[in-house]
Swiss-Prot record:
Gene Ontology BP, a term: toxin catabolic process
Species for this entry: Arabidopsis thaliana (Mouse-ear cress)
Domain GST N-terminal: 2-83
Protein name: Glutathione S-transferase F3
Keyword Transferase: yes
Annotated localization: Cytoplasm, Cytosol
Gene Ontology molecular function, alphabetical: glutathione transferase activity
Amino acid sequence: MAGIKVFGHPASTSTRRVLIALHEKNLDFELVHVELKDGEHKKEPFLSRNPFGQVPAFEDGDLKLFESRAITQYIAHRYENQGTNLLPADSKNIAQYAIMSIGIQVEAHQFDPVASKLAWEQVFKFNYGLNTDQAVVAEEEAKLAKVLDVYEARLKEFKYLAGETFTLTDLHHIPVIQYLLGTPTKKLFTERPRVNEWVAEITKRPASEKVL
């Protein structure tokens, strides 16, 4: 049976989300480069792996998956006893699992849409020869500040967003934060003491640094 393959781009935050999970699990894998600038993700053979034309796609033997957060959850469960545990300390505890699931949903629907717009404006536009729209940055930073206020309150109660242990909830934030730390938006993280500590810890994990 073939090993693990990730079809994506190393600069993609969604691809990085999966790569960090694999590194946390100390799993061997092959990264199959998909060139986004050439539109390879919108053509065959990639579309046969993800009909929506978005990276990454994933294979583990005969299993084929797409959507990065679904992939990381598969990795966390399939390889639960290998490497870092990415699930709640008691993965059979329904309440703990539900809290982690809330965090995953909050990241996907409250944090990431705003943070990704800021990364696009301040990082990725430059790669395409486009100018940053400062009005958009100001608008999105105001939204992100509100999300981070919620995080600050949560992190005053717990070490991590889903409790006292590092889980997928925290991991899913890492790739876009890595980009935003190199922009003026960094101030939104550093001016909140607990958020700042949390960001420093999760971005300095060995698995996180391997995708830079």
